[in-house]
């Protein structure tokens, strides 16, 4: 049994908001930890499920009786202490740690539903990938959660393909977490030790870092870059072209992060360039995502079959989301607002293919300025 270096009078209650492919995989490992560490966590882990019917049965009923998410994570047995719940308020109330794992376009609606319903001492972790863009600048999704719910939110991001994690194949991740002083106080701290105990498994290693901005930006932009990789795959250009896309993508990600103050991103400290090259949330996540994730698959299908992005998403993902499609638009809007399009030729070229009938054949010319 793991012993906390800090006294824990009442074990922490953990819940998961989201039950898609990645949401269920994360819920599985968290529930495993909660069952094994009763001195730190309460045993049962509620997982909010957007209710659907599968062959005449409610998805929550299937998960709770057969312990399998047959739609989003089939053929993976889930812990019996993972409880599917269709009521979002009931899921989060009284939770000490709330893990958000939903498509980022739904975040605003979800947090509004639970505003004022969560414990003021709760903490949150965002597994979402994306940015909240407005004419004034850019907000991290974790900051959006904090601003609405008035609880501190960190970020989990890394080279994590959901099915591999769910099968127990070894991988690692980054948790970016730095609690500001105004959120500290008696009974209010869930420290990095607790987070590591909640997420770390023998097959899922966790490194806790402080760079929330860097991890968030890398997690958002890698999905756009992965779309570019899918485009060149669809065009049949091979591994050399994919490597070039990833190199330019890393460079543009670091450049994007350097504008964090201009973009008015709230942060306790500036992004650390080492996050992008040394942490799982950086280059490792980019490599994994560009090696065959859903963004690559959708983008590849677009080019091979000459269909638009949303049609490809519907056909390939069957109801799930390709976050790169939406993020490409958000990033373009941000760069346009600050007149920075010319500094990000890859991100802009990707946007044009998705939204302006641009051609992947133009990539070599559009990226010439990066050389």
Curated annotation (Swiss-Prot):
Belongs to the NAD-dependent glycerol-3-phosphate dehydrogenase family. Induction: Mildly induced by estrogen (17beta-estradiol). GO terms for molecular function: glycerol-3-phosphate dehydrogenase (NAD+) activity; NAD binding; protein homodimerization activity. SUPFAM superfamilies: 6-phosphogluconate dehydrogenase C-terminal domain-like, NAD(P)-binding Rossmann-fold domains. GO terms for cellular component: cell surface; cytosol; extracellular region; extracellular vesicle; fungal-type cell wall; nucleus; peroxisome. It catalyses: sn-glycerol 3-phosphate + NAD(+) = dihydroxyacetone phosphate + NADH + H(+). Coiled coil: none annotated. It is found in: Secreted, Cell wall; Secreted; Cytoplasm; Peroxisome. Transmembrane segments: none annotated. May catalyze the production and accumulation of glycerol during hyperosmotic stress conditions. Glycerol acts as a osmoregulator that prevents loss of water and turgor of the cells. Mediates evasion of the host innate immune system by binding inhibitory components of the host alternative complement system, in a manner dependent on estrogen-induced inhibition of EBP1. NAD(+) binds at residues 18-23, 50, 106, 162, 294, 323. InterPro entries: 6-PGluconate_DH-like_C_sf (IPR008927), 6PGD_dom2 (IPR013328), G3P_DH_NAD-dep (IPR006168), G3P_DH_NAD-dep_C (IPR006109), G3P_DH_NAD-dep_euk (IPR017751), G3P_DH_NAD-dep_N (IPR011128), NAD(P)-bd_dom_sf (IPR036291). Its EC number is 1.1.1.8. Its main location: secreted. Disruption phenotype: In presence of estrogen; decreases binding of host complement factor H protein and increases phagocytosis of the fungus by host. Decreases virulence in presence of estrogen in a zebrafish larval model of infection. The active site is at 222 (proton acceptor). Disulfide bonds: none annotated. It comes from Candida albicans (strain SC5314 / ATCC MYA-2876). GO terms for biological process: carbohydrate metabolic process; glycerol-3-phosphate catabolic process; glycerol-3-phosphate metabolic process; symbiont-mediated suppression of host complement activation. Substrate binds at residues 129, 294-295. The gene is GPD2. Keywords: Cell wall, Cytoplasm, NAD, Oxidoreductase, Peroxisome, Secreted, Virulence. This is Glycerol-3-phosphate dehydrogenase [NAD(+)] 2.
């Amino acid at each position: 049994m793991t012993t906390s270096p800090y006294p824990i009078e009442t074990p922490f209650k953990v819940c998961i908001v989201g039950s898609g492919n990645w949401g269920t995989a994360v819920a599985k490992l968290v529930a495993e930890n909660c069952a094994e560490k009763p001195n730190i966590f309460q045993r049962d882990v509620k997982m909010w499920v957007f209710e659907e019917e599968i062959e005449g049965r409610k998805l929550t009923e299937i998960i709770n009786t057969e312990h399998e998410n047959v739609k989003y994570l089939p053929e993976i047995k889930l812990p019996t202490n993972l409880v599917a719940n269709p009521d979002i308020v009931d899921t989060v109330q009284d939770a000490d740690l709330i893990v958000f794992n939903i498509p980022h376009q739904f975040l605003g609606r979800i947090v509004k539903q639970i505003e004022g319903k969560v414990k003021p001492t709760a903490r949150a972790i965002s597994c979402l990938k994306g940015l909240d863009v407005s004419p004034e600048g850019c907000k991290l999704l974790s900051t959006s959660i904090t601003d609405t719910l008035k609880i501190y939110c960190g970020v989990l991001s890394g080279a994590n393909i959901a099915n591999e994690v769910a099968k127990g194949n070894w991988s690692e991740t980054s948790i970016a977490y730095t609690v500001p002083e105004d959120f500290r106080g008696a009974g209010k701290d869930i420290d990095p030790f607790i987070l590591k105990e909640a997420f770390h498994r023998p097959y899922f290693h966790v490194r806790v870092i402080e760079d929330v901005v860097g991890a968030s930006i890398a997690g958002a932009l890698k999905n756009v870059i992965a779309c570019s990789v899918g485009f060149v795959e669809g065009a049949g250009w091979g591994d050399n072209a994919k490597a070039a896309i990833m190199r330019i993508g890393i460079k543009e990600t670091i450049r994007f992060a350097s504008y964090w103050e201009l973009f008015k991103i709230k942060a306790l400290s500036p992004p650390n360039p080492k996050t992008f090259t040394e942490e799982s949330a950086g280059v490792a996540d980019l490599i994994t995502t560009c090696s065959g994730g859903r963004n690559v698959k959708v983008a590849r299908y677009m080019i091979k079959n000459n269909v638009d992005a949303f049609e490809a998403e519907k056909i390939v993902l069957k109801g799930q989301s390709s976050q790169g499609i939406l993020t490409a638009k958000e990033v373009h809007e941000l760069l346009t607002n600050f007149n920075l399009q010319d500094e990000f030729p890859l991100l802009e070229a990707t946007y044009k293919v998705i939204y302006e009938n641009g051609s992947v054949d133009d990539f070599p010319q559009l990226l010439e300025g990066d050389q």
